[in-house]
UniProtKB/Swiss-Prot annotation:
Entry keyword annotation includes Zinc-finger: yes
Record GO biological process: protein folding
Occurrences of domain J (ranges): 7-72
Zinc finger region(s), CR-type: 118-202
CDD domains tied to this protein: DnaJ (cd06257), DnaJ_zf (cd10719)
Co-factor: note: Binds 2 Zn(2+) ions per monomer.
Protein name per UniProt: DnaJ-like protein R260
Stretches for region Disordered: 364-398
Length: 398
């Protein structure tokens, strides 16, 4: 889990395609892990517990989740739905220093394969267009029938006096339920747009895939957002990566692959293929006698995101019993017979792999993630965060 994340799905270690059951399971697991009773005196765990509960409160509610997926968290916080959509309330950042334009936001999930192989992807967006039949007023007489209670603001301010103090409380207008128009004039609603003032249609558009998709995942489509004050505002597409089997993301934004091997392969060597999302086949070679340490992470240069490093770690299935052959010569072949079977057979020597896609583990840079090992090289340790464990090697659930 990325503890700095503000995306509600990432906080729960999920993607936007997660089912209701996935959300329930992830919430229960993380709530137990970060519960204050188990993390006394740990302010980071306490803060994470709050984030987990907040994320669950939105994603476990189907209506709130729908609004969040379409418009973002600001829309949920302002209690918006399709009938009371208020872009002004939703995007208050327009009025903050340095923000010149109002923007809507939507999320789009992209696979690792598409990220590595495509420069553009097709995104289906909902486009607002002015209703010409009512001149965008929502009424057949083309007049703006604003709510008489709130004067078209959708909200009212009530004052509560408490002694010498006056408290102001902002609420949805009771006259129009936040819809801003005179609800008593429904008989004048435009039949074409059903009183919305706009017509919605779906449009498929080509969008550039961000190169630095983790730190800068946004692409802005000018004039493709909701209809506000007589024009379409800009639409911000936020790309979210969906990870393939075996691939995850570390806390410091490194792509990591977990290879599963059996005990004999940790000592007797192997030749295995990683199906990289770029379409390349990466040949991983361990020579007989090279010992695979489950605490080590191996670094594959230029095979990660943004041409960065790909991390490779191993999950080792240990044998329950070892059978020592009698009167056998001690060699790797007989050692493997004693230790058990391989996880998968080795690939052949000649499979046509490009030289730059062949990685011998004995020649790769390594990170030792074992905090109890004091023999680590200090320079290597500091390069990856120090303190006996490289910074960010922990993986977010996907």
């Amino acid at each position: 889990m990325n503890k700095e994340s503000t995306d509600l799905y990432e906080i729960l270690g999920l993607t936007p395609s997660a089912s209701e059951e996935d959300i329930k399971k992830a919430y229960r697991k993380l709530a137990i892990k970060y519960h204050p009773d188990k993390n006394k005196g740990n302010p980071e765990a306490e803060e994470m517990f709050k984030k987990i509960n907040h994320a669950n409160s939105i994603l476990s509610n189907s209506e709130k989740r729908r609004v969040y997926d379409q418009y973002g968290e600001e829309a949920v916080n302002n209690g918006l739905n399709e009938d009371s959509f208020d872009p002004m309330s939703m995007f208050m950042r327009m009025h903050q220093p340095g923000n010149k334009k109002l923007r809507a936001q939507m999320r789009h999930q992209i696979s690792l394969q598409d990220y590595f192989t495509k420069k553009t992807v097709k995104v289906t967006i909902t486009v607002d267009s002015k209703c010409d039949d009512c001149d965008a007023t929502g009424f057949s007489d083309k007049q703006k029938h604003v709510c008489k209670v709130c004067r078209g603001k959708g909200i009212v301010v009530n004052e509560i006096r408490n002694g010498p103090f006056i408290q102001q409380i902002q609420q949805h207008c009771h006259g129009c339920q936040g819809k801003k128009y005179d609800t008593t004039a429904k008989d004048l609603h435009c039949p074409s747009c059903k009183g919305a003032g706009i017509n919605k249609s779906e449009e498929e558009t080509e969008v550039n895939v961000p190169f630095d998709i983790l730190r800068n995942p946004k692409v802005i489509l000018e004039g493709k957002g909701p209809w506000v004050d007589g024009k379409n505002i800009d639409l911000e597409i936020v790309f979210i990566l969906a990870f393939s089997d075996g691939f995850e993301l570390t806390d410091n934004h490194k792509l990591i692959y977990t290879m599963e091997i059996n005990f004999p392969e940790t000592l007797c060597g192997f030749r295995r293929i990683i199906d990289h999302p770029s379409g390349d086949s990466l040949l991983i070679v361990a020579n007989p006698g090279f010992v695979i340490n489950p605490h080590y992470i191996y670094l594959l240069e230029r095979k990660g995101l943004n041409n960065d490093t790909l991390y490779l770690k191993f999950k080792i299935n240990y044998s329950k019993l070892i059978h020592i052959p009698k009167k056998k010569v001690f060699n790797f072949e007989n050692l493997e017979i004693a230790l058990g079977t391989r996880y998968v057979p080795d690939v052949s020597d000649d499979i046509g792999t490009e030289p730059e896609n062949v990685f011998n583990l004995s020649t790769l840079r390594q990170i030792n993630t074992d905090p109890s090992d004091e023999s680590q090289d200090r320079d290597s340790e500091e390069s990856y965060g120090g303190h006996g464990r490289p910074e960010g090697v922990g993986c977010a659930q996907q």
